[in-house]
Amino acid sequence: HLTPVEIQLAIGLCEIFANQITLGEAEVQAQLVRDAKIKALQAQINPHFFFNAINTISAILRRDQEKARELLLQLSNYFRANLIGARETEITLGQERTQVDAYLELEQTRFPQKYNITFDQQVENDVYLPPFTIQVLVENALKHAFGARKDHNNVQITIKKLGARLVIQVADNGEGIALELLPKLGKEPLTSSKGSGNALYNLNQRLIGLYDERSALQITSSNKGTKIKISLPYHIKEGADNESLNR
C-alpha cells in the first residue's frame, strides 16, 4: 500500500503534468493575440531542471518523506508560476519571488552548501514586472558563474526603487565573463553547452517588446564576479493582488 506521502507525491506529479498540458494549450492560444512573440519568449521551461528536481525528490523520499513532500510542493509552485507567466506579460513581484524561492530551494537541496543566496528586497510585493525577470538572472548566475567551484559561491539579489525606476541586480563572486562575450550578452543569441545561452537575449527582447527604450540591461564583469542590472518603469496596479502563489 502507498503511504500518505507517496500518495501526495503521485498527486503532485499528476498536477505538474496536467499543468504542462495546460501550458501547451495556453501557448497555442497565445499565438492568436497581439503579443504572441513576447509570450513565446517567456514560456520556456528547462526539461533538465524538471528531471533533476524529480531525481532529487526521489532521493530525499528514501530518508525524509516530509522534506520530499515540501520539495514537491515547491516544484508544483515553480510550474504553476510558469503557467501564469505564459499567460501574462506582467506579474507581481510576490508571484515572481514564489517561483524564484521554489527554484532556489530545489537547487540548494540538490547542491547542499554550494551556494550562498541573499536577497535585499527594498520594495513591496505589489510592484509589477515581466515574468521570469529575476528567475532568468538567478538561474544564469547559478549555471554559469562558478564553474566547478563547490563552495563559497555567493549570489546577491537586490530589488529597489530608484526614482521612477524598478532596479533589479544580481551579483555573483564567480569567475567572470570572457571579454569577447561581454559585448554580445543580451544583444544576440549565443550557444551554450548548458542550454541557456539565449536566456539573457530572450529576456532583453521581452523587455524591449514591453517597454522599448524605457528598459535597460547592463552587464559588468571581471575575474572577481559579474553584476547584471535591469531597470524598468516602476508601477503598481490599482487593486492588485499583493499575495504570492502560496496564498
Predicted regions: what is each one?
Residues I236-A240:
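Short, charged low-complexity linker/loop segments at the C-terminal edge of domains
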Residues D241-R247:
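Intrinsically disordered, low-complexity acidic/proline-/asparagine-rich linker or regulatory tail/stalk regions
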Residues T226-H235:
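Short C-terminal beta-strand
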Residues L2-I45, F49-I219, T226-K227:
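Two-component histidine phosphotransfer core
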